[in-house]
C-alpha cells in the first residue's frame, strides 16, 4: 500500500506515530513559511502541516486544491486552543517530513465544497469531482450498506442470489424496450429487460424456491421527473408461499434498512385496501404523515341544481386556513389542476363568520350552503376544493390537491416515517385510461403486470367481469412513495392464457412472445410469489435526498442524456452496417422439434 493509515482514522492516541497518508488537497492556508493543508481521502480529512522547504523538496511549491499527494510525517496533538471539534481528526495534525505529488489538478470547474450549491448539469458532467464531496460520497456508501443489510436478511432465510440475463427477447411489460441489434443474426434484436419477472418465475419452476438479486432494469419511457432509463430493483421470488409470507419478509427487509439510519420500524405494518386508499386519500400510495382525507359529496348533492355537481362522483378536500388565499393564488390553483388534465378545481371559501363565498357558492341552494361546512368538516377560514366527474380521475385530482395542500400549509412532519401496505388492487384497468404501453389489443391492461394472480375468489370469473376482479397483489408505501410491489403469481397455464385473452393477446401472439413461460407451466410449476423494491427510491429516502439521481453513481439527466459521456451518441456507418441495423431478418430453418419460423 502507498499509505500506512487512512486520513480520517487518526486520533489523539496516534500522537507520536510516524504515518504515511495519501489523498487530495481539500484546502491550503499559508502562514509565515508554513502551509496548512486539509488532506482528504475516502475516510475523512486531517490537517497536515508542511514547511516551505518540504514543499520545495517535493516539487510542490505550487500545490493547490485537488492535487493528489502522498505525505509522510509525525502525528502530534494540535496546539492548545486549535482543536477542531467539527471533524473526528480535529485533535491532531501531521507534521510533514516528506511530500510527493502523485498527480496535479487542472483548474476546477467548481469548488469541491460541501456548502457550495453547484448546478446539476455541471455536477453530472464532472461527476468524478462531485463524488469527492462528502454528501454525494456518503450517499453511495449508504447504498452499499443498504445492499449488505438486505443481503443479510435474505441469506438468513436461505435465499440464493442468481443473475438473470440482460440480453433477452422483447416481451413487453408496460413500457417500451431498449433494443440491441444482434450482429450475428442480422435483422434480429435483443431487448434489455424491464424486469427479471419471467426469468425469476422460471427459476421457481426450476425448483430454486428462494431467489433474489439486485437487478438492473431498463425502460424506454417518455421523460418523467425523477425517472431513470436504467435503474435497480431488489428482486425477490419465493415458492410455496402466500401473500402474508412475502409481506412478512418484505417487512423484515424494511426494518433492517431503516435501522441503518437509527429508526426502528414497528412491525407488522398496517394494511389498507386499494379501494379504501383511493376513496380516503385519492392515491394508491397515500402519505399518512398528515390527515386531510377526501370527503364523498355525491350524496350530499344528490338533489343539486348545480350542473357541475350532477356527476357520477363529487368529492372534496379541505385546506385549513385556505380562505385567506388571494384571488391570484386561487386562480393559480386552476392552472395547477389543468396541468394535471382537469378542467379546473372548484372551490368554496368559508368566511370567519361561517358564510360561504366564491364562484361555486352562489350556485348552491340555501340547504346546501347551510350544511356544506359541517359535511366536509370545514371550519371558518378554510377553503373547500371540489372535483366532480368520473370517479377515478376526480379522486386522483383531489389526492394530488391533498398532497399539495399539505406541502403549502406545512402539515407534513418531515422527520416522521409512515409505512403501509396497499392490497387488493384491481387486476385490470381500462386501456383507454392507461398511459403505459399496451401489450395487447384488448380494452383491458393489467394494473400490475400480466403475470399477477387473481384473488382466489375470482379465479373462475375474472375474465367474465374484468372490471371488478381484484388481484393478489401488494404494494409497500413509505411517506407517499411506492417503494416496492409484488404479487402472488399465476402458475397455471390455463389461467395465464385467460389473462392474456382479457388483454387482447391472441393465442398466436401469446405463443410467440411468452411460449417459453407457458411451456414451463406445463411441467409442474409451483405456486409462487415475490416482491421487488425500487432500490434507487429506497436509498434516496434513507439518504434524505429529493432525487434518485443523488444515490446513483453516474445518473442520466432529463430525457436520458448523460452529460459525462454525452450518451446517447450517433454511431458510424460502419458500426451500423456491422450491427445489421437495417437488415431484414432471415426466416430460420426449423430444427428438429422446433416449429418453423420460431
Swiss-Prot record:
Record: residues binding ATP: 219-221, 228, 482, 534-537
Chief location bin: cytoplasm
Compartments in which it is found: Cytoplasm
Positions of L-aspartate binding: 173, 219, 448, 489
Annotated GO biological process: aspartyl-tRNA aminoacylation
Reactions listed under catalytic activity: tRNA(Asx) + L-aspartate + ATP = L-aspartyl-tRNA(Asx) + AMP + diphosphate
Full protein name: Aspartate--tRNA(Asp/Asn) ligase
Organism this protein belongs to: Kineococcus radiotolerans (strain ATCC BAA-149 / DSM 14245 / SRS30216)
Amino acid at each position: 500500500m502507498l499509505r500506512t493509515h487512512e486520513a480520517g482514522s487518526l486520533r489523539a492516541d496516534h500522537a507520536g506515530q510516524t504515518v504515511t497518508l495519501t489523498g487530495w488537497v481539500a484546502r491550503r492556508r499559508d502562514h509565515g513559511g508554513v502551509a496548512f493543508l486539509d488532506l482528504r481521502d475516502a475516510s475523512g480529512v486531517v490537517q497536515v502541516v508542511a514547511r516551505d522547504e518540504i514543499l520545495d523538496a517535493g516539487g510542490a511549491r505550487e500545490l493547490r486544491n485537488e492535487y493528489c499527494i502522498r505525505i509522510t510525517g509525525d502525528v502530534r496533538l494540535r496546539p492548545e486552543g486549535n482543536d477542531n471539534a467539527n471533524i473526528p481528526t480535529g485533535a491532531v495534525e501531521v507534521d510533514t517530513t516528506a511530500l510527493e505529488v502523485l498527480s496535479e489538478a487542472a483548474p476546477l470547474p467548481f469548488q469541491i465544497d460541501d456548502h457550495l450549491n453547484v448546478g446539476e448539469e455541471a455536477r453530472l458532467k464532472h461527476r468524478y469531482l462531485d463524488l469527492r464531496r462528502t454528501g454525494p460520497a456518503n450517499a453511495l456508501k449508504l447504498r452499499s450498506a443498504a445492499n449488505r443489510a438486505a443481503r443479510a436478511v435474505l441469506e438468513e432465510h436461505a435465499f440464493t442470489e442468481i443473475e438473470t440475463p440482460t440480453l433477452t427477447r422483447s416481451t413487453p411489460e408496460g413500457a417500451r424496450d431498449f433494443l440491441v441489434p444482434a450482429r450475428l443474426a442480422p435483422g434480429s434484436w435483443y431487448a434489455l429487460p424491464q424486469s427479471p419477472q419471467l426469468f425469476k418465475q422460471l427459476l421457481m419452476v426450476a425448483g430454486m424456491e428462494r431467489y433474489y438479486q439486485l437487478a438492473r432494469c431498463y425502460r424506454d419511457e417518455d421523460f418523467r421527473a425523477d425517472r431513470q432509463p436504467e435503474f435497480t430493483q431488489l428482486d425477490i421470488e419465493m415458492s410455496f408461499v402466500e401473500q402474508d409470507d412475502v409481506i412478512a419478509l418484505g417487512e423484515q427487509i424494511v426494518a433492517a434498512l431503516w435501522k441503518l439510519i437509527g429508526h426502528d420500524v414497528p412491525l407488522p405494518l398496517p394494511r389498507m385496501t386499494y379501494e379504501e386508499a383511493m376513496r380516503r386519500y385519492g392515491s394508491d400510495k397515500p402519505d399518512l404523515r398528515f390527515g386531510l382525507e377526501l370527503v364523498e359529496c355525491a350524496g350530499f348533492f344528490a338533489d343539486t341544481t348545480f350542473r357541475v355537481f350532477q356527476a357520477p362522483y363529487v368529492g372534496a378536500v379541505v385546506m385549513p386556513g385556505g380562505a385567506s388565499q388571494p384571488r391570484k393564488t386561487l386562480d393559480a390553483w386552476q392552472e395547477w389542476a389543468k396541468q394535471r388534465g382537469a378542467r379546473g378545481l372548484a372551490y368554496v371559501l368559508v368566511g370567519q363568520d361561517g358564510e360561504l363565498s366564491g364562484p361555486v357558492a352562489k350556485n348552491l341552494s340555501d340547504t346546501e350552503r347551510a350544511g356544506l361546512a359541517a359535511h366536509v368538516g370545514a371550519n371558518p377560514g378554510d377553503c373547500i376544493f371540489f372535483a366532480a366527474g368520473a370517479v377515478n380521475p376526480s379522486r386522483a385530482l383531489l389526492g394530488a390537491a391533498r398532497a399539495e395542500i399539505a406541502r403549502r400549509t406545512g402539515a407534513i412532519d418531515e422527520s416522521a416515517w409512515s409505512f403501509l401496505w396497499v392490497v387488493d388492487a384491481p387486476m385490470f384497468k381500462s386501456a383507454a385510461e392507461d398511459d403505459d404501453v399496451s401489450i395487447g389489443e384488448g380494452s383491458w391492461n393489467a394494473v400490475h403486470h400480466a403475470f399477477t394472480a387473481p384473488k382466489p375468489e375470482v379465479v373462475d370469473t375474472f375474465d367474465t367481469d374484468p372490471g371488478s376482479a381484484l388481484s393478489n397483489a401488494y404494494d409497500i408505501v413509505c411517506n407517499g412513495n411506492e417503494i416496492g410491489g409484488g404479487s402472488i403469481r399465476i402458475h397455471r397455464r390455463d389461467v395465464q392464457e385467460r389473462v392474456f385473452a382479457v388483454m387482447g393477446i391472441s393465442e398466436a401472439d401469446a405463443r410467440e412472445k411468452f411460449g417459453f413461460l407457458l411451456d414451463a407451466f406445463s411441467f409442474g410449476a409451483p405456486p409462487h410469489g415475490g416482491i421487488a423494491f425500487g432500490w434507487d427510491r429506497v436509498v434516496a429516502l434513507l439518504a434524505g435526498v429529493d432525487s434518485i439521481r443523488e444515490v446513483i453513481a453516474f445518473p442520466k439527466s432529463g430525457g436520458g442524456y448523460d452529460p459525462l459521456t454525452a450518451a446517447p451518441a450517433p454511431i458510424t456507418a460502419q458500426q451500423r452496417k456491422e450491427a445489421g441495423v437495417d437488415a431484414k431478418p432471415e426466416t430460420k430453418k426449423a430444427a428438429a422439434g422446433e416449429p418453423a419460423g420460431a
